[in-house]
Amino acid sequence: MEKQTTLATVNSPTDTVLNLSTDSGFYTDWKYEYQLDTEQGIANPYPTDTIMPAATRMISTLCAFFKLPHSIEFSAIDTLEQLVIETLKKDASPDKFAENVVENLPFYVIAILSLVSKCFNARTILDPALQKQILQANFPDLEWNEQKLATIEFKVMKTLNYKVSQSLLLGAVERFTKEDILTRGIARKDFVGSLGIKLLRVVYAQKSQIYASLKPNVKCQDLFTRFKSNKLILAAATVTAILKFCAADEELVADNVVKRLSNDCFVEPKNITLLRDAIVNVIR
């Protein structure tokens, strides 16, 4: 019998940076997934803004304690959001469900992290003793309940049909960064990779605020919904924000990058620039 690896003890130097090697895996028919994801986002009438900001920060915090790689961190965020969407579709009282998730958020996060970790590597588990220790240390008002955790884990797996959502946003950011920043020799690879992960955490945590800041300029709600649902555009804006924080203020370089990314995303360059500025503004 193979020994299971406790993910909380696994951590490598590359876990804290973007995967900027040439074998990232986002090269075969890669835009189809994003087109499909955009259409699903447009069709989803269930807003998750009341739950996801706090959930995103909690996932990032617990991933740091468990020393989980960022690929699991960002995929866990997307998987939790998918869980919320799928449940709201079927739940007769969505407000009650939202309250239940918020009240028991640490348990939901642990359940999601456990599922995503196993899907990334079937031999890995989260150390149960460490789960209890971390939750009690970070959420002292939370009463530890193994039965409740087991019930939530079962509910999560059943609702998601044992499927997780790999982070399309992370994949696109890695691809665009390799093609549009590293090839220009603007900054060191390790610096760009570390900066990219930090910016992605901000984008995930502040996504609702970032898009809300653009609403005063919106003339067509349907087009804005499509814009918000497109992870390629968000990835492009994130990469141009990385470029900006690399002190690459040369207007010609920035314009060339935005123009090329706009062709990949099938969007006007100014829309990428507006979204980039919104990202930068939530940081400043």
PLM regions and their residue ranges:
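Cyclin-like alpha-helical protein-protein interaction core
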Residues: S12, G25-Y27, K31-I110, V116-F266
